[in-house]
């Protein structure tokens, strides 16, 4: 039990080895009128539970923000944290090959090339064709 300002009581539970938890950092705040829950394993959402009302899901980048909250948002809503880091890793691997004059075949599996781009374009074309033809199966080899 913890006691905060204005005699507010709380409960703090900390564990690095709790059964069924991986690296879950969770904050739950309970009050007389409701509760607020957030988990770092699902960081784009917070759940607001008001007594006698349906739960509300609050999204990162959603409409319930104040102007100061935008300062900590680096990516648009719907993009997961780590999105930018994924691209940064590709650039880092490419720079490593170029700057250190490594054998390009050594890290080639990590880097997308023209063939990867062609496969993606075929997939997009097949998806559009399928959609335009009543969702029929479209083989990528036919594109």
Positions of the model-derived regions?
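C-terminal/domain-terminus segments
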Residues: 107-115, 141-143
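Short secondary-structure junction motifs
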Residues: 24, 107, 133-135
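Short linear motifs in exposed loops
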Residues: 13, 39-40, 140-141
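C-terminal capping/lid region of NAD(P)-dependent oxidoreductase domains
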Residues: 129-143
